[in-house]
Amino acid sequence: MKTLYSLRRFSHVETLFNTTLAVAGRDQETTGFAWWAGNARLINLSGKLLGAHVAHAGLIVFWAGAMNLFEVAHFGPEKPMYEQGLILLPHLATLGWGVGPGGEIIDTFPYFVSGVLHLISSAVLGFGGIYHALLGPEIIEESFPLFRYVWKDRNKMTTILGIHLILLGLGAFLLVFKALYFGGVYDTWAPGGGDVRKITNLTLSPSIIFGFLLKSPFGGDGWIVSVDDLEDIIGGHVWVGSICIVGGIWHILTKPFAWARRALVWSGEAYLSYSLGALSIFGFTACCFVWFNNTAYPSEFYGPTGPEASQAQAFTFLVRDQRLGANVGAAQGPTGLGKYLMRSPTGEVIFGGETMRFWDLRAPWLEPLRGPNGLDLNRLKKDIQPWQERRSAEYMTHAPLGSLNSVGGVATEINAVNYVSPRSWLATSHFCLGFFFFVGHLWHAGRARAAAAGFEKGIDRDFEPVLSMTPLN
């Protein structure tokens, strides 16, 4: 009688120490997993699993290169990036490539080079993935003992963790080196409306860097998302990179403590769940960063933040009505509060009207007009520069609002405003991805814990509905 499932299906998250175990093929009979279970069929085949991961990396890098070139081909220098639906070129521009004063794009060749390099890299990764999936040894340690691992081997797993941490730390230092030595990065706070500059005076004070982590996430505090100068951002990368590298070396040289051996589940599916949980946190954090932060994600490339667009509208109409003779310091609105200017609960002078809720916005085009107690009336009357007027009028009409059918802008505008902000796309996508990764974390964590406790049996293959259905062919 044909066996529809293997007993090894019942210990699917554990790898046996018996290295003589024959793993014949990649079908349901020999692995206990059907074709749609994906890489689960390769749990015990380290060579094939390596091929799957390398090929997956190739697909990711191919998308990056192809999408990069697609955006270069469609880019028009006469419009800002955020009006053109771009999500990759803004990242390259933020790193200081091809950008001039004020965020103007003066050279697209670096973007073309980036796309080509990613395509070439994806070809190398794709070849490596195909080689390891089809031609290389199924179990890699049979040919290369150095790469032998068993999911239950706690010491080997923490060594692999350490290697990953060192690589992540080196990645963080790549940004540091770019900012310090290789041309600098784009600083939206540079005088006169932003420019590329080298970062010379890093913030390395632990009280400042780790103070961000201890801040409240609410209101004007904003947790780490409140960072608003590049010295802090690059200094933070020095700290993160150093901690990752030191932590990686520590994990390579040490063995897990007894409490860690007891508290954690040591299986392939458990490691998957830990990774998904970490990625979920990354996704939610990136969502908040791209939505609220206009230093790491300059508005010149990503469009204004929601609060920024709102404050820009108040500023634009203050400029207009002041020219028409309005006394912006004394005019009252329909509620009796200041029409153009009012005081915040802490006594600062802020913009009046509905935008009062965004009174703690900080933006490069607005900060020069502040004094010690908020907005300075004398500066508003005498010091407003043309570039500030132009930028606020532009941001006012490009709020990061709108739906997927590209009817964007603010609610008072006509439907012809065909615009969805990259901030909307990036924040929404990272929130959704973060959420689904969190669900995946819970799912795989539950399965891993159940398997470790000995009562997870998976789907009963004897009574699977698909087995009683007519074959597709």
Swiss-Prot record:
Cofactor binding notes: Binds multiple chlorophylls and provides some of the ligands for the Ca-4Mn-5O cluster of the oxygen-evolving complex. It may also provide a ligand for a Cl- that is required for oxygen evolution. PSII binds additional chlorophylls, carotenoids and specific lipids.
A Pfam cross-reference name: PSII
A biological process from GO: photosynthetic electron transport in photosystem II
GO cellular component, one term: plastid membrane
Residue stretches spanning the membrane: 69-93, 134-155, 178-200, 255-275, 291-312, 447-471
Membrane-protein topology: Multi-pass membrane protein
Chain residues in the propeptide: 1-14
Post-translational modification Phosphothreonine, affected residues: T15
Subcellular location: Plastid membrane
Keyword Membrane: yes
Main location: plastid
Organism superkingdom: Eukaryota
Modified residues (N-acetylthreonine): T15
Family indicated by similarity: Belongs to the PsbB/PsbC family. PsbC subfamily.
Subunit comment: PSII is composed of 1 copy each of membrane proteins PsbA, PsbB, PsbC, PsbD, PsbE, PsbF, PsbH, PsbI, PsbJ, PsbK, PsbL, PsbM, PsbT, PsbX, PsbY, PsbZ, Psb30/Ycf12, at least 3 peripheral proteins of the oxygen-evolving complex and a large number of cofactors. It forms dimeric complexes.
Protein name: Photosystem II CP43 reaction center protein
Lineage: Eukaryota, Viridiplantae, Streptophyta, Embryophyta, Tracheophyta
